[in-house]
UniProtKB/Swiss-Prot annotation:
Catalysed reaction, written as an equation: myo-inositol + NAD(+) = scyllo-inosose + NADH + H(+)
Annotated Pfam families: GFO_IDH_MocA, GFO_IDH_MocA_C3
GO terms, molecular function: inositol 2-dehydrogenase (NAD+) activity; nucleotide binding
Name of this protein: Inositol 2-dehydrogenase
Keyword Oxidoreductase: yes
Subunit structure: Homotetramer.
Entry function: Involved in the oxidation of myo-inositol (MI) to 2-keto-myo-inositol (2KMI or 2-inosose).
Coiled coil: none
Family in the record: Belongs to the Gfo/Idh/MocA family.
One record GO biological process: inositol catabolic process
Length: 339
């Protein structure tokens, strides 16, 4: 439990996601302050230092040596997560780690082994959809059984465009990664297999990408999930889910922006970025984490074990981009530490 009036949070990574979290903790979150910004790029660190009273460091080790933080948000690119998680756990810091936990399951297992040397889980994963009001309402419907048993889920995940650095495998590891967490959470069952189908290619997509793709996810309880992953749709950012039950259906993620009638046309404003579509979910996620750290429970959402399961699903999904048929996999036995 923190002994200071406000939890002193360090933010690792000052790119788009890190800068968003810095602003969020500074302007929205109660009970916490940004005390350290860990970013090797001096320009980014300076730009992100808008948080009053924060200090910039080139590495987490430097911030730890200066006793500049009590908890850390990791928002670096995924390939660097293990490099930050190891010293954070060694110092006993509570961690909110943006997805993914690590790029592959072998790294994830190493992180799990290190975390289990502590007295309890210290890592919360940044799968913010679990904190979205609509996703929570849908999960409550599934759990209640009011519409009968859940039979299958249908998802769409659409981006207007992606940066030049976005590669084919990132359709899975940077985008569908969210479905690999939230769909099992909704259905109450882990992923058993992943298959990728290719519809007609969008010739307006970047030359390096073959998309959209249709991802078929089978869960261990028999629920089937299909996800349209489309990153060149142009019109906006859209994430939606339909659930089919024994006695009805339910939908979330429908457009809810400005409704306009003009020139004999009707339109509804749509989001253009995940930062606005899930702004409230991000706020709720970070606030829940801060509250958990302050009360000593440390984790108030998906944990490192959930991150390991998602890493396995991503590995299967990347294989499925080039291999036919469902790619099945089985996780290691779940340690009692994560019960």
């Amino acid at each position: 439990m923190t002994t200071t009036p406000d939890l002193r949070v360090g933010v690792g990574g000052a790119g788009q996601m890190g800068a968003d979290h810095i602003q969020r903790i500074t302007r929205v979150i109660s009970g916490a302050t940004v005390s350290a910004i860990v970013e090797p790029d001096a320009g980014r660190a300076a730009a992100a230092a808008a948080a009053p009273g924060s200090r910039a460091f080139a590495s987490l080790d430097d911030a730890l040596d200066a006793s500049a933080l009590e908890a850390v948000v990791i928002a670096t690119p995924g390939q660097f997560h293990e490099l930050v998680l190891v010293p954070a756990l060694a110092a006993g810091l509570p961690v909110l780690c943006e997805k993914p936990l690590t790029p592959d399951s072998a790294e994830a297992l190493r992180v799990l082994e290190l975390e289990q040397t502590l007295d309890r889980p210290h890592i919360q994963l940044g799968f913010m959809r679990r904190f979205d009001d609509e996703y929570r309402a849908l999960r409550e419907l599934v759990v209640s059984g009011d519409a009968g048993e859940l039979l299958f889920l249908r998802g769409v995940h659409r981006n207007p465009s992606v940066p030049e650095s976005y590669t084919q495998s990132m359709l899975i590891t940077d985008s569908v990664v969210h479905e690999f967490d939230v769909m099992p959470w909704l259905a109450g069952s882990p992923v058993a297999s992943v298959e990728v189908k290719y519809p007609r290619r969008n010739d307006r997509a970047p030359e390096r990408l073959r998309e959209p793709i249709l991802v078929l996810i089978e869960l261990r309880n028999g629920v089937l999930v299909d996800v349209e992953m489309n990153v060149s749709v142009r019109f906006g950012y859209q994430v939606a889910t339909e659930a089919v039950f024994q006695t009805g259906t339910a939908r979330i993620g429908q457009p809810a922006g400005l409704q306009r009638w003009s020139d004999a046309r009707f339109s509804i404003a749509e989001h253009t970025s995940f930062t606005t579509r899930f702004a409230r979910a991000y706020d709720a996620q970070v606030q829940a984490w801060v509250d958990a750290v302050r009360d000593g429970s440390l984790v108030a959402g998906p944990n490192a074990w959930d991150g390991y399961l998602v890493a396995l699903a991503c590995e299967a999904g990347v294989r499925a981009l080039s291999e036919p048929g469902p790619i099945a996999f089985a996780p290691a036995e779940r340690p009692a530490f994560y019960a």
